[in-house]
Amino acid sequence: MPSFDVVCEANMVEVKNAVEQANKEISTRFDFKGSDSRVEHKEQELTLFADDDFKIEQVNDVLMNKLAKRNVDVRFLDYQDKQKIGGDKMKQVVKIKKGVSGDLAKKIVKTIKDSKIKVQASIQGDAVRVTGAKRDDLQSVIAMLRKEVSDTPLDFNNFRD
């Protein structure tokens, strides 16, 4: 029986490349000369460092631009509050969302069941497995989910025949 998984995860290689490009641009830009502005990437979070609130926003704009150019959906980013660190420096932590949350998984399953397409959807950890008798049914489910669930970036992988 054909099946696929609905997941929510960013391409971490592209995120890393975007962070490196953003840091390179920040180091060469005139308005950042003499400031300690940078973006750090650790596991599932990014940390923006800058001298003041305005420069944090500028660093964020550069990062967003680089992520968009590398086709990374910015809806994966979850911004935390800005924090003051030593002296006049500031930082902001940005968490990268991974996995389908419980509420979103229930919404996806309900949307699939309400569509009356002959497929079964089941929640498996941080993914939703969709199985059906025909490949065409699965493709119509993918198209329907892309249209219905637009507030969260969804990926479809592990497609099996």
Swiss-Prot record:
SUPFAM superfamilies: YajQ-like. Pfam families: DUF520. The keyword Nucleotide-binding applies. GO terms for cellular component: cytosol. It comes from Ralstonia pickettii (strain 12J). Nucleotide-binding protein. Belongs to the YajQ family. This is Nucleotide-binding protein Rpic_2826. InterPro entries: DUF520, UPF0234-like_C, UPF0234_N, YajQ-like_sf.
